[in-house]
From Swiss-Prot:
Homology family: Belongs to the universal ribosomal protein uS5 family.
Keyword rRNA-binding: yes
GO CC, any one term: cytosolic small ribosomal subunit
HAMAP family named among the record's database cross-references: Ribosomal_uS5_A
Comment on protein domains: The N-terminal domain interacts with the head of the 30S subunit; the C-terminal domain interacts with the body and contacts protein S4. The interaction surface between S4 and S5 is involved in control of translational fidelity.
Residue span, S5 DRBM domain: 54-117
The protein's name in its UniProt record: Small ribosomal subunit protein uS5
Gene: rps5
PANTHER family recorded: 40S RIBOSOMAL PROTEIN S2, RIBOSOMAL S SUBUNIT
NCBIfam families from the UniProt entry: PRK04044.1, uS5_euk_arch
Known role: With S4 and S12 plays an important role in translational accuracy.
GO annotation terms (biological process): translation
Molecular-function GO terms, alphabetical: rRNA binding; structural constituent of ribosome
UniProt-listed InterPro entries: Ribosomal_Su5_D2-typ_SF, Ribosomal_uS5, Ribosomal_uS5_arc, Ribosomal_uS5_C, Ribosomal_uS5_euk/arc, Ribosomal_uS5_N, Ribosomal_uS5_N_CS, Ribsml_uS5_D2-typ_fold_subgr
Length: 214
């Protein structure tokens, strides 16, 4: 179930990086401007300012063991998917003895991993021109898992695995097909492969990009 990402108190935020200072001073006023200038997200508060009202969902919880001098210590490992359901998405992981703390760490990690997702109408069966799907086929890999995401006609829906469906929904993609290879039962690698594929939507320069640059 989607939950709203808790934001930090921006008034009390003291930036630790030059990019954070630019954001707090209003010299960078949108997340799009940040990515257009090829600047990294160096503090989670940057996302709180530039991309408010994000939502997240916990998609995987594991209990992992760590060997110490005192013996094995059990901790929770949490994987979350985060996005604004309108072109920005992220994933994050967190580990802690308490589940609540692990989720908080995963949310913080996800804020640092926000990426823009290029949307479009790339299916030859659809000519609506609306950003309901992907503009072209993209491929992502993580571990042994490979995910191919393909554009689909409007109204098709998300014909993908359940976890991948969550990822695409948070990215704002409504119609898509997918093919997968490898050990897709490993939830984290499956999600990371899908995230990698979405990241690759901006590795290609389209005709529209050339027109905008001119």
């Amino acid at each position: 179930m989607a939950e709203e990402v808790p934001s930090l108190n921006i008034e009390e935020w003291k930036p630790r990086t030059s990019i954070g200072s630019l954001v707090k001073e209003g010299k960078i006023s949108s997340i799009k401007e940040l990515f257009d200038r090829n600047l990294p997200i160096t503090e989670p508060e940057i996302v709180d300012v530039l991309l408010p009202k994000l939502k997240y969902e916990v998609v995987d919880i594991k209990v992992v063991q760590k060997q110490t001098d005192a013996g094995e210590i059990s901790r929770y490992k949490v994987l979350v998917i985060m996005g604004n359901m309108d072109g920005y998405v992220s994933i994050g992981t967190g580990k802690a003895k308490q589940l609540r703390v692990a989720i908080q760490k995963a949310i913080r990690d996800a804020k640092m991993n926000i990426i823009p997702v290029r949307r479009g109408c790339g299916s030859w069966q659809c000519t609506c021109g609306e950003p309901h799907s992907l503009p072209f086929k993209v491929v992502g890999k993580a571990g042994s898992v490979e995910v191919d995401l393909l554009p689909a006609p409007k109204g098709t829906g998300l014909v993908v695995g359940s976890v991948l469906k969550t990822l695409l929904t948070y990215a704002g993609i409504k119609d898509a097909w997918s093919t997968t290879k490898g050990e897709t039962r490993t939830t984290e690698n499956f999600v990371r492969a899908g995230y990698s594929a979405l990241y690759n939507t901006y590795k290609f320069v389209t005709l529209q990009d050339w027109v905008r640059k001119r």
